[in-house]
């Protein structure tokens, strides 16, 4: 690499991740612009905090990006790289692909790209990560859906003669009729269940949202299940969680997303549907799929599922069209 001495300066960047009690130093070539760059800068937890504040992300994204940057810096240290280049980031990405899911690789590389973009803006290091791609993520859904018959089988297997059983049945019914995500069930409060016109609705705080602006209609059968569950909680207030934990360790607290996933998974397994591709999120896929099969338009289902882009809804329609395609059977009939 040829360096013009008039417009470049050679600096040392000390990257310290004190959590791991290790310090990594990398020499960097940084472009001098209108004002001079500091001869050295320590990239510590304080610098990482500034970076996170810059991206202004949700707590979950903050945790992911922090973890991603720490792992990248550790990778540089292990590989003895003191002056990372674009090729190093590509090598790091390819190594991630060997042991991580495409979605994880994608989020980690996005974090690295943003980090170097910010470093260049701060005149600490040139943006060597610009335009580097992460991992190709399939648009096909990784979770299966249940047929209407399978839904009935699962729900009939949930015993409703105990408070826990009534709660579990209500959760399952709400998720499959409303297409709710586990985080939406977790965040729901009793006061979010309201009357709107002639319908009972549940206002939701969706994924990445800070307020309850959207809602789903709650069918009579689902509302009955929810009311039966709430009847077991005589001291519940309007501001109380819609569903609470009944385990000894967290009894009375807001139910966790992990518990919701476990409740759904247990019900599926009990009904004989034990598959890695059938999870709590499958109930959302089920809701969208049954809506389309029932004749609802793409626009109606998009609104119901709270898809920001109709292309997401179209993926479901495409999958259904593919399942209805009889080309393979036509060929088999012709040659056998």
What are these regions (language model features)?
Residues 2-4, 8, 14-336:
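Conserved catalytic core of the tyrosine transesterase superfamily
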């Amino acid at each position: 690499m040829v360096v013009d001495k008039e417009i470049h300066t050679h600096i040392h960047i000390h990257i310290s991740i004190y959590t791991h009690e290790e310090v990594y130093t990398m020499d960097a070539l940084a472009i001098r612009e209108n004002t001079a760059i500091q001869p050295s800068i320590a990239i510590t937890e304080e610098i990482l905090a500034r970076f996170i504040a810059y991206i202004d992300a949700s707590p979950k994204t903050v945790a992911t990006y922090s973890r991603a940057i720490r792992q990248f810096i550790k990778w540089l240290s292990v590989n003895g790289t003191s002056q990372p280049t674009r090729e190093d980031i590509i090598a790091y990405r390819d190594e991630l692909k060997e042991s991580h899911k495409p979605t994880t690789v994608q989020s980690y590389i996005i974090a690295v790209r943003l980090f170097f973009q910010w470093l260049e803006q701060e005149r600490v290091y040139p943006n060597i990560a610009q335009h580097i791609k992460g991992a190709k993520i399939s648009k096909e859904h990784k979770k299966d859906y249940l047929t209407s018959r399978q839904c009935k089988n699962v729900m009939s297997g949930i015993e409703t003669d105990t408070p826990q059983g009534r709660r579990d049945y209500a959760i399952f019914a709400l998720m499959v009729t409303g297409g709710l995500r586990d985080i939406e069930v977790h965040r729901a409060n009793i006061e979010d269940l309201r009357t709107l016109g002639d319908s009972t609705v549940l206002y939701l705080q969706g994924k990445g949202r800070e307020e309850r602006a959207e809602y789903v209609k709650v069918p009579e059968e689902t509302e009955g299940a929810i009311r039966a569950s709430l009847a077991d909680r005589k001291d519940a207030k309007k501001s109380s969680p819609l569903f609470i934990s009944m385990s000894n360790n967290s009894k009375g607290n807001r139910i966790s997303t992990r518990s919701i996933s476990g409740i759904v998974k247990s019900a599926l397994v009990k009904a004989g549907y034990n598959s890695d591709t059938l999870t709590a999120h499958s109930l959302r896929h089920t809701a969208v799929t049954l809506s389309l099969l029932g004749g609802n338009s793409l626009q109606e289902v998009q609104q119901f599922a709270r898809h920001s882009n109709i292309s997401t809804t179209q993926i479901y329609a495409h999958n259904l069209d593919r399942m209805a395609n009889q080309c393979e059977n036509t060929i088999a009939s012709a040659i056998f």
